[in-house]
Amino acid sequence: MMSASPEFYKPAPVFSPCSSPLRLLQQQHGEDHQEEYGYGSSGGCCRTPTGGESNLKAPGTCPPAPRKPRAPAAPCRKRLFEVEVLSLRLEELERLFWRPPPPPPTTQPQPQPQQPPQKRRRVAKLGS
């Protein structure tokens, strides 16, 4: 890597009131403009404004700290109604959930589904 050569180093320019934009404004407009902006015969180039419009207002009261919003109400876990219990006999249940009986077994022998052929395994022979 290359390091910066000291011959190319330039320090930052120092602030000078002569190069201030206020000083340039003073030179352009003359003495009447100096008194208007307050940097005339008093010797300084800037001063704190003392007019009524620049004064701070009286401190008011601070607003309250922000609060976390309340969580929405959870659904009620308590039962608000009576549960009606029904008692049914087995015949009534079978009638409600009736399934057709399975088909009777056939006397013809069904063909066996074909088995997929066995996979061949390769065996490595040692010492041949």
From Swiss-Prot:
Regions of compositional bias (Basic residues) in chain numbering: 118-128
Biased composition (Pro residues): 99-116
Localization terms from the record: Nucleus
Main location (coarse class): nucleus
Keywords, ordered alphabetically: Cell cycle, Nucleus, Protein kinase inhibitor
Region (Disordered): 23-76, 96-128
Any one of the GO CC terms: nucleus
A molecular function GO annotation: protein kinase inhibitor activity
Role according to the record: Probable cyclin-dependent protein kinase (CDK) inhibitor that functions as a repressor of mitosis in the endoreduplication cell cycle.
Protein name: Cyclin-dependent protein kinase inhibitor SMR1
